[in-house]
Amino acid sequence: MKFIDEATITVSSGKGGRGCVSFRRERFVPRGGPDGGDGGSGGSLLFRVNPSKRTLYAFRSKKQFAAPNGAPGEGRQKTGKSGDDLVIEVPPGTLIFDADTGAIIRDMVSPEEDFVFLTGGRGGKGNKHFATSTHQTPRFAQPGEPAQTATVRLELKLLADVGLIGLPNAGKSTLLSVISAARPAIGAYPFTTLSPNLGMVTLAGAEPFAVADIPGLIEGAHTGAGLGIRFLKHIERTRLLVHLIDASAIDPADPVAPFRIINAELAMFSPALAERPQVVVLNKMDLTGAEALAQQFINAAGIKKCFLISAATRSGVEELKKHLFELLCSHDT
């Protein structure tokens, strides 16, 4: 399924049904009074968080959503049937914006959260309501209230505890695949990952936590180079970043270059994101020469704690998982 994280749709509630003009007509009651029933209410339009959804793919082709109208009232004081509410399901982390003004309407984050966006129109009153002592046969009724219509822009920002960042081919997708049940595309070439992936990491006796793998960034991403910064929004909600570096590709002439490039791009996108706590991880330690290059990076960067792992062989991965869990727990307190 293609990853879709933005969509613009037009939504409407249902209009209220018209009130009925009717008079009681029964044998031996030649001049029965008005008995027109009320119209039914139109259906409301709601947005609901569905935790099983991970993309806005459902809105790729369908752009119009309308709740049913209320039915008109009937004789014998029968109220018309109300229109059913229309529920639009969205993934957790969906932002709803006014398409015209850009103002944020709602941030849908809580599981099973319901947001009544457009209320259905009330049904019109039947003519039974308008009889008076001086006007006992009203031949009019109220129309139902009109529907409400709006155009909204939906934007998805994944809800993850940890975000994986790094240059292309650093091994982010491989790491995600070994620490979770996620199965992202993996290849030995840059830009294998073309959209974010989300995985749940589990530890024995502990609450699982979510990790997002973001497509690799390159220098100049904030100006649109490579895949640009379109997907960086998906780690804005994270509490922690894992900065993954390919140890085997470190340049001895400038060992800190990969680290510096990514952090510069983060700062260009969002100063707040650049200040997010980071765990620095040197990957591909199983490759020839990686150990010496990793030491050069550590010396040049002056980082006190750095994890040395091989996602391919899973060396050091369990220790990393435990450390991430401990950090997340400490940030909760």
Curated annotation (Swiss-Prot):
Keyword Zinc: no
GO CC terms in record: cytoplasm
Subcellular location: Cytoplasm
Annotated binding of GTP, by residue: 166-173, 191-195, 213-216, 283-286, 310-312
Enzyme class: hydrolase
Biological processes, Gene Ontology terms: ribosome biogenesis
Gene Ontology terms for molecular function: GTP binding; GTPase activity; magnesium ion binding
Record-linked PROSITE patterns: G_OBG, GTP1_OBG, OBG
Cofactor requirements of the protein: Mg(2+)
Region spans: Disordered: 63-85
Biased composition (Basic and acidic residues): 75-84
Gene3D superfamilies: GTP1/OBG domain, P-loop containing nucleotide triphosphate hydrolases
Residue ranges of every copy of the OBG-type G domain listed in the record: 160-329
Keyword Hydrolase in record: yes
Organism superkingdom: Bacteria
EC numbers on record: 3.6.5.-
Domain Obg: 1-159
Alphabetized UniProt keyword annotations: Cytoplasm, GTP-binding, Hydrolase, Magnesium, Metal-binding, Nucleotide-binding
Subunit description: Monomer.
Matching HAMAP family: GTPase_Obg (MF_01454)
Cited function: An essential GTPase which binds GTP, GDP and possibly (p)ppGpp with moderate affinity, with high nucleotide exchange rates and a fairly low GTP hydrolysis rate. Plays a role in control of the cell cycle, stress response, ribosome biogenesis and in those bacteria that undergo differentiation, in morphogenesis control.
Family of this protein: Belongs to the TRAFAC class OBG-HflX-like GTPase superfamily. OBG GTPase family.
Name of the protein in question: GTPase Obg
Species, as recorded: Desulfosudis oleivorans (strain DSM 6200 / JCM 39069 / Hxd3)
Organism placement in taxonomy: Bacteria, Pseudomonadati, Thermodesulfobacteriota, Desulfobacteria, Desulfobacterales
